[in-house]
Amino acid sequence: MLKKTFAALALGTALLSAGQAMAAEYKIDKEGQHAFVDWKISHLGYSFIHGTFKDFDGNFTWDSAKPEASKISVDLKTASLWSNHAERDKHIASADFLDVKKYPEAKFVSTAVKSTGEKTADVTGDLTLHGVTKPVTFKATFNGEGKDPWGGERAGFNATTTLNLNDFGIKGPGATSQTLDLDISVEGVKQK
């Protein structure tokens, strides 16, 4: 009986979804300050240093009827890091840490999306940072989608993960932790 109920529910969902839009391509809206790549790292175990990467770009494919078919790609310029402290930023950008002259870009490309709830998913992909590529999983939340006041359509997500900097051949600067929390907020504009 349970199998028949599940099959009927799945068929009904499929029929309802058939009339809805297929997967659409979205460009991340960083120009309108609607997307952020923020980070934080523990300082001495007493507080956190917060920062952001100001120069990044990306896109994603999204179909609310089939979240598992979604994909995302984000490229960022490592020299665009900012923590509201010029000397610290210079040190983090140096060969002691990110070595932005040698590794000017970081990139994330998703390889799998697994729904974990009505509006949540695990987004796994390859992160290339400091010349090293490793699989990373982000905990993602779907914030919503719909029309915007300018005649377009948008969709928004938040995603978080914690990186072990040693995995990427990075030694923490000074008295900071070896783990870094990433918090990515994106709003995408549907491409026509």
Curated annotation (Swiss-Prot):
Gene3D superfamilies named in the record: Lipid/polyisoprenoid-binding, YceI-like (2.40.128.110)
The leader peptide range reads: 1-23
This protein's record includes keyword Signal? yes
Q: Name one Pfam family in it.
A: YceI
Its cellular-component GO annotations read: periplasmic space
Residue ranges of coiled coil: none
**Assigned keywords, A-Z:** Periplasm, Signal
Protein name as catalogued: UPF0312 protein PputW619_0484
Say where the protein is mainly found: periplasm
Q: Where in the cell is it found?
A: Periplasm
Annotated NCBIfam families: PRK03757.1 (NF002994)
What is the similarity comment for this entry?
Belongs to the UPF0312 family. Type 1 subfamily.
